[in-house]
Regions:
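P-loop NTP-binding/switch modules centered on Walker-like glycine-rich loops
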Residues: 179, 183, 187-265
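Conserved ABC transporter NBD signature motif
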Residues: 68-76
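Charged, flexible cofactor/metal-binding loops and thiol motifs
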Residues: 2, 25, 236-326
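A short, proline-enriched helix->beta-strand linker immediately N-terminal to the Walker B motif
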Residues: 168-172
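Conserved ABC ATPase "signature" region
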Residues: 76, 126-144, 250-254
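Helix-to-loop junction immediately C-terminal to a conserved catalytic motif
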Residues: 60
Length: 326
């Protein structure tokens, strides 16, 4: 779907298991294969607890998978240690959901933005003020905000500072973990526009984690839908909503609120509860919530298969379901 020469991150067969009480294991990510490309956004969407943040933490080397490899420009970053790992971190940056908790409240905005540059000895301390003002203006904030503290700013302004800090090292990849979910809708729109502008200017690859599939559709070039640690659908963003093939993806789309929607139509929710990750049933992980579940779904785990160019679905009966939906 994308030019292979633009491939920057190739995550192969990523699995993460955590030990649990009673000798059990919790599988947070199960055999995940995803790629990030320069200048493109991969949206990773799913309900809370599905494993999307766990997966993205591997890309920024905050955790290591139990199995699998993550190739960054062809090099497996899961094997990096010490100084080699420290130097690698400048190439992949992260914007967290709550910038307040990722800032030192005693540091001025000038110091917050320039700390990464000082860590890698890319500027002198005397240059901090000019650099901070430059990057504040780059994220559409006044340069004199450099003298402020985080508590003197609104949530949207703090998130812009977080983005400025993320881009100050000119990274090739930025991971955004629910970076807009705590913001008002109007502020959210401005932040999204800023992200897209910076991506176009700097050709950055973005991993965008979100639980709102409607928002992801407006931001991403490619969308991966995750459920209970599994990728159940991987598709070009333009395939939503008409070509959504997995029942879970369809259910997520039906629950999206739209101001232009028919208000006589009920906003649907997904019936049932997510199974315990300590006791995942055999077969399809979505079986107990799927209205189309059949016997095969309870015994055989569906694998991702291509139904359209660049569009893969992990469902035994997605094509039949598509005909029924029509």
């Amino acid at each position: 779907m994308f030019d292979e020469k633009d491939l920057i991150i190739d995550a192969r067969h990523i699995t993460r298991r955590f030990p649990a009480a009673g000798g059990k294991e919790l599988t947070a990510c199960n055999d995940i294969n995803l790629q990030l490309y320069r200048g493109k956004t991969l949206g990773l969407v799913g309900e809370s607890g599905c494993g999307k943040s766990t997966f993205m933490r591997f890309l920024v080397s905050l955790d290591k998978p139990t199995e699998g490899e993550i190739l960054f420009n062809g090099k497996d970053i899961t094997k990096l240690k010490g100084e080699e790992l420290r130097l690698h971190r400048q190439h992949i940056q992260m914007v967290f959901q709550d910038p307040t908790n990722s800032f030192n409240p005693k540091m001025k905005i000038r110091d917050i933005i320039c700390e990464p540059l000082l860590n890698f000895k890319k500027i002198r301390p005397s240059e901090k003020d000019a650099v901070a003002r430059k990057y504040l203006e780059m994220v559409d904030l006044p340069g004199d905000f450099a003298d402020r503290y985080p508590h003197n700013m609104s949530g949207g302004q703090r998130q812009r500072v977080a983005i400025a800090r993320a881009i100050v090292l000119d990274p090739e990849v930025i991971i955004m973990d629910e970076a807009t979910s705590a913001l008002d809708v109007s502020v959210q729109k401005n932040i999204i526009e800023l992200i897209l502008k910076l991506q176009k200017e700097k050709n950055i690859a973005i991993g965008f984690i979100c639980h709102d599939i409607g928002l992801v559709r407006s931001v991403a070039h490619q969308i991966a839908v995750m459920y209970l640690g599994n990728i159940v659908e991987l598709m070009p963003a333009e395939d939503l909503p008409q070509k959504a093939g997995h029942p879970y993806t369809q259910a997520l789309m039906k629950s999206v609120f739209d101001i232009n929607m028919d208000f006589s139509k009920k906003i649907e929710s997904i019936e049932g509860e997510v199974p315990s990750p300590l006791d995942v049933p055999p077969g399809c992980p979505f079986q107990n919530r799927c209205e189309y579940c059949r016997e095969k779904c309870k015994t055989d785990r569906p694998l991702l298969k291509e139904i359209y160019p660049g569009h893969k679905v992990a469902c035994h009966f997605c094509q039949q379901i598509g005909e029924m939906e029509k």
